[in-house]
């Protein structure tokens, strides 16, 4: 029997509180998660160089919590916490990969330990699973370490996952944003056609390495005399912001913005 989770994240708690409304009032939910970005590296947080106009506008329209902390500052444990509402000491996913100290990478034992890590998610009801009980369709894009998107309870998604080749932490999901937003557009149109509320997990692989931003963005930061490595990172932060603007445009063009919570 899965443990019923207690949502401790302020965002998830806030979202679940909205579900006391009638079915007709269920909001769509968009969960935006940047990757390897310092909390200071946004215009609305006062960064002197990085431009994030789309998120700045969103921040002006939103409640902003400026003091957030994570006990396990790694990608996979943090995403597992967002999906389950439990900290790493509860869900058991405390690292990105099995330790090579105990099994050689690529060995059968290593793969067994990796499968064991993925299975830890089975202890809990995930946020997409809870939303599905309330009639939501859900879509995964971007980073996802826990196997196929279906393993997280998403009804739709991009990540094929373990044990398929290339399924370590996102495979096809890592293309979102960097190579366009078409999978999200198709999903939103599908949800609208089905007359279902939807949940979007937008875990875009930005501004994470590789720092290969469009030249038009990189040029802006190189002209400020910044070291090239810094200029590339700053440009990737702005690139992330651009994709968030594209995501919001998808909602606005379909008249969905007023019926959507963006976290």
Predicted regions and their residues:
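Formylglycine-dependent sulfatase
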Residues: 8-12, 19-263
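Positively charged n-region of N-terminal signal peptides that target proteins for export
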Residues: 1-5
């Amino acid at each position: 029997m899965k443990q019923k989770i207690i949502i401790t994240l302020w965002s998830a708690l806030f979202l679940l509180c909205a579900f006391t409304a009638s079915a007709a009032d269920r909001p769509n939910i968009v969960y935006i998660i940047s990757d390897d970005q310092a909390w200071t590296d946004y215009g609305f947080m006062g960064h002197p160089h990085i431009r994030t106009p789309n998120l700045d506008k969103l921040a002006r329209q939103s409640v902003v919590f400026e003091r957030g902390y994570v006990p396990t500052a790694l990608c996979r444990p943090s995403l597992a916490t967002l999906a389950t509402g439990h900290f790493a000491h509860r869900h058991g996913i405390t690292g990105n990969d099995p330790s090579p100290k105990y099994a050689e990478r690529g060995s059968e034992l290593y793969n067994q330990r990796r499968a064991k890590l993925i299975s830890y998610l089975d202890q809990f009801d995930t946020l997409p699973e809870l939303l599905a009980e309330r009639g939501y369709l859900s879509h995964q894009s971007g980073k996802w370490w826990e196997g196929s998107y279906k393993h997280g309870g998403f009804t739709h998604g991009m990540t094929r996952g373990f044990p398929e080749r290339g399924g370590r932490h996102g495979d096809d999901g890592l293309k979102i944003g960097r190579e366009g937003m078409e999978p999200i557009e198709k999903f939103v149109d599908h949800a609208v056609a089905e007359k279902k509320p939807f949940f979007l997990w937008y875990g875009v692989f930005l501004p994470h390495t590789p720092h290969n931003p469009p030249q038009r963005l990189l040029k802006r930061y190189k002209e400020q005399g910044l070291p090239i490595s810094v200029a590339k990172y700053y440009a990737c932060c702005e690139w992330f912001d651009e994709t968030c603007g594209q995501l919001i445009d998808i909602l606005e063009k379909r008249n969905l913005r007023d019926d959507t919570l963006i976290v």
